[in-house]
Amino acid sequence: MEELLTIAFRTVVLYFVILVIFRFMGKREIGELSILDLVVFIMMAEIAVLAIENVDDHLFHTILPMLVLMIIQVTLAYFSLKNRKVRQLLDGKPTIIIKYGKIDEEAMKSQRYNFDDLMVQLRENSIDRVADVSFAILEPSGKLTIVKKENSGEHRQLEMPLIIDGFIQTENLSRISKDRKWLLESLQKHGYTNPSDISFCSFTDGEIYIDEKDGHRT
């Protein structure tokens, strides 16, 4: 009986400890968890199970590694927020699977993504024909984001990020047949001289959108 009460007590304590730790780690939908999140969650679950089973082991021996995991996750999340390269390393980056109704088989192979997966996710988005898709983007979470054709049958343009967190996205500039010089000239027309002052800048349908960083002029 005493052992059962101990198990119940440890279960309740660890439940609230994990709850607090997850709260500090930030909010995220289950479908949007990164590999880092999954690794941390799985390790915490294993540690908790071992702690509940080994009633003779001190709870501190369980809580300490959980706190260490939390510190690792929060630290990496901070650097991921500040640095896009770190973010891409930890979370991966989106991959264009369909462009203007044409499937990119090489992109699918690189992501180990097969045609069955593609057709399932198209059907889930009420898409019957690949030709009706302007863009299909495989997100790091595994979700397929779809941009449909216009009602007129014309393909829609994908919003292309040109600046993220103050850093120019050279690869995306080449995708729209533009260069760094063109971008800097466009920014100057809008009154910006330094890309580092810009939080996000994108290009779509011939128009440029600019969102400056907090604390800069409006």
Curated annotation (Swiss-Prot):
Is Transmembrane a UniProt keyword of this protein? yes
To which species is this protein native?
Bacillus subtilis (strain 168)
- Protein name in the entry: UPF0702 transmembrane protein YrbG
Subcellular location as annotated? Cell membrane
- Membrane: is it a keyword of this entry? yes
Q: What topology in the membrane does the UniProt record assign?
A: Multi-pass membrane protein
TM region positions? 4-24, 32-52, 59-79
Which GO cellular component terms, listed alphabetically, does the Swiss-Prot or TrEMBL entry include? plasma membrane
Q: Name one Pfam family in it.
A: DUF421
Q: Which Gene3D superfamilies match?
A: bsu07140 like domains (3.30.240.20)
Per the record, the major location class is membrane
Q: Which family does it belong to?
A: Belongs to the UPF0702 family.
Q: Which UniProt keywords apply?
A: Cell membrane, Membrane, Transmembrane, Transmembrane helix
